[in-house]
Design a protein with these regions (language model features):
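Active-site-proximal beta-strand elements of phosphoester/diester hydrolases
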Residues: 3-8, 118-119, 159-163
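A short, acidic, flexible beta-alpha connecting loop/helix-capping segment that sits on the rim
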Residues: 155, 164-169
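Cysteine-nucleophile active-site neighborhood
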Residues: 45, 50-128, 168-180, 185-188
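Residues that mark the start of a beta-strand
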Residues: 3-5, 25, 74, 117, ...
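RNA-binding accessory domains that recognize and position tRNA/RNA substrates
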Residues: 1-41, 53, 166-168, 180-192
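Structured helix-beta-strand junction loops
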Residues: 22, 41, 71-72, 134, ...
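Catalytic beta-strand/loop cores that center a nucleophilic Ser/Cys/Thr
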Residues: 114-156, 192
Length: 192
């Protein structure tokens, strides 16, 4: 199976379950791991997990790790990981007055024009006006408030979602994002 490093910001079991279903060889590292420690493991990909807390309080070294690792291996960031991926690439994250919680938020996937329903538990969101369009493009938006729900890097095989793509709890129509990550890792592996 593919070798995947998961950076633990408050890892959900559902992410491990999705990884197991795809027969990944998982190494879980703490958020304090450096880019060198991660890359020494020679992973096929890196997942930045979801978790609690204010993304604006993260150590600068975490942002430096993201900026370095995204240039070397495919990256998939979820929840807090998505927010940190955004910050590392120049976006701002702000606390929202009314948190998003629920299992069937309508999310617009821009590239396909499809509507998917996803589970959310969000207290912070990427400020859409702060997204550096030369670095990132917005891939998903919340249909209720037009908030940024997904990002993709323009130059590197790195993407992120604010919502839970694992269907636990809630709809599983977005768990194809894990398959997209597998495809990204496989394409990257073909170049070696």
């Amino acid at each position: 199976g593919l070798s995947v490093v998961v950076i633990d910001f408050g890892l959900k079991n559902a992410i491990l379950r999705e990884s197991s279903r795809r027969k990944w060889n998982i190494t879980v590292l703490p958020y304090t791991a450096t880019a060198e420690e991660i890359l020494r493991l020679d992973p096929d990909g890196v997942v930045l997990s979801s978790g609690p807390g204010n993304p604006n309080n993260v150590r600068r070294s975490v942002l430096e790790m993201i900026r370095t690792v995204q240039t070397k291996v495919p990256m998939f960031a979820i929840g807090l990981g998505h927010e940190l991926f955004g910050i590392a690439n120049g976006a701002n994250v702000q606390q929202i007055p009314v948190e998003h919680h629920g299992v069937n938020h309508p999310i617009h996937e821009i590239i396909t024009d499809h509507i998917v329903y996803a589970t959310q538990a969000e207290g912070y969101l990427i400020d859409r006006n702060s997204v550096d369009r030369s670095q990132l493009f917005i891939t998903y938006v919340d249909m209720l408030d037009n908030s940024v729900q997904g990002l993709r890097h323009r130059r590197y095989p790195a993407f992120s979602v604010q919502f839970f793509p694992d269907g636990a709890p809630g709809p599983d129509e977005t768990d194809g994002l894990f398959d997209e990550f597998v495809d990204t890792m496989n394409r990257r592996g073909d170049r070696h």
